[in-house]
Curated annotation (Swiss-Prot):
It is found in: Cytoplasm. Cell wall formation. Catalyzes the addition of glutamate to the nucleotide precursor UDP-N-acetylmuramoyl-L-alanine (UMA). GO terms for biological process: cell division; cell wall organization; peptidoglycan biosynthetic process; regulation of cell shape. It is an enzyme of class 6 (ligase). This is UDP-N-acetylmuramoylalanine--D-glutamate ligase. It comes from Elusimicrobium minutum (strain Pei191). Belongs to the MurCDEF family. Transmembrane segments: none annotated. It comes from the Bacteria. Keywords: ATP-binding, Cell cycle, Cell division, Cell shape, Cell wall biogenesis/degradation, Cytoplasm, Ligase, Nucleotide-binding, Peptidoglycan synthesis. ATP binds at residues 115-121. The gene is murD. SUPFAM superfamilies: MurCD N-terminal domain (SSF51984), MurD-like peptide ligases, catalytic domain (SSF53623), MurD-like peptide ligases, peptide-binding domain (SSF53244). Its EC number is 6.3.2.9.
Amino acid sequence: MFKSSKFKGKKACVLGMGKSGLAAARLLAENGFSVLISDGGKREIPGNLHKNIEVETGGHTNKILDCGFIVKSPGISSNMPVLKKIKNKKIPIFSEIEISISFLPKGCRIFAVTGTNGKTTTTMLLSEILKQFIKNKEFNKNVFTVGNIGCPLAEVMSEIKQHDLIVMEVSSYQLEDSSYFKPYAATILNITPDHIDHHGSFKKYLDAKSKIFKFQTQKDIAVINSADKNCLKAAKNIKSKLYGFATTPLQQIRSHVFYDGDELVFSAGERISPPKLPGIHNVENAMAASLLALAAGVDSQSIQQAFNKFKTVEHRIELLGIKKGISFINDSKATNIDSTIIALRSMPDGKKTWLILGGQDKGSPYGVLLPLLETKCKKVLLVGQAAAKIKKDLPGYKYFNVCGTIDKAVEYAFNNAQKEDIILLSPACASFDQFNNFEERGKFFKQIYKSL
């Protein structure tokens, strides 16, 4: 657990000069710490850095080993040689969220959302619910939406006041690095194999996700998907008050909310219509957000009002429009196989979908896609570094076309698709082979759509 008073006078080292690393460095510098930012890549050093911040790029020097504590950016592999040196010297390592939380004003409550899929949508839903509740009750509070969603907590720390609410999307990378993280209310939406290339095994990935509940007490709230066996494992020994949701009929008996095909039905008697978003996965996201809110004292009217106003999340099964009778759907946020499965389940049967698949491989097998490809897809257009592995993992599927890049895939699909067909970008892979992030990939797809 990071306490600034314990490390007073000691130099901090921030490993990685990404968005969260820079935000953590600035926060520490503004609170009197001398900071070394060390980045292994050849990055451009930002202007207007605080006078207490020193930067080294292009490699990690032994200056790191003279620091009193380390802040590890979430994308950095735990197997890096420099981290082994740090651990051998027993220098404490913290995550950006741990550092940031230590500077939070009194009375702030953290609502944390994790899961393999659905994190961003659920985070946004919960934020809108809390904002609506505060507006209805005329409370003098603000809601800050932070974390893996794109805005580090450290970046907005100067704006946060006592008793404000923090809604945080938390990734397995962030949880892995946290020695102490205690949200007031937290949910695990689902857990399926992902990021195995980073964590090394599914067990380590599951262990990282499970840390969201680890330090909670009986006064805290935990929400899980009762139909997900891995979520049940993650919640096995928790101390917090546990709530469950499920769309699967067999699991409804041990859930606090289920879906009757029309409304969310809560064990306390409330009935709420879910937001108008495609797919059963979004019903589950709405269940998780509403359970967190209800358990924290939010009324059902505020939840319903927020759901009625809610619009789809950018880059997640996002309908861009229709051209020549062909629908274009941007699901660039599908950076793993399970996300693509969810997207394909949302598509109509009858082989009308032209699926753009591929990018940077993350180590999971693609064979599980076969049943959906056979029932939903007219053709699969392969792009990026993972193309060869996808073909190898799906020897029984014949309708591939290797396009290499997204623009070529769209051109091929648009020239061959018929009225009422769908061109779906849902890559099931990371974007880093051709783009900086999934947002950039999604925006590129949107630009192509607009240019047709």
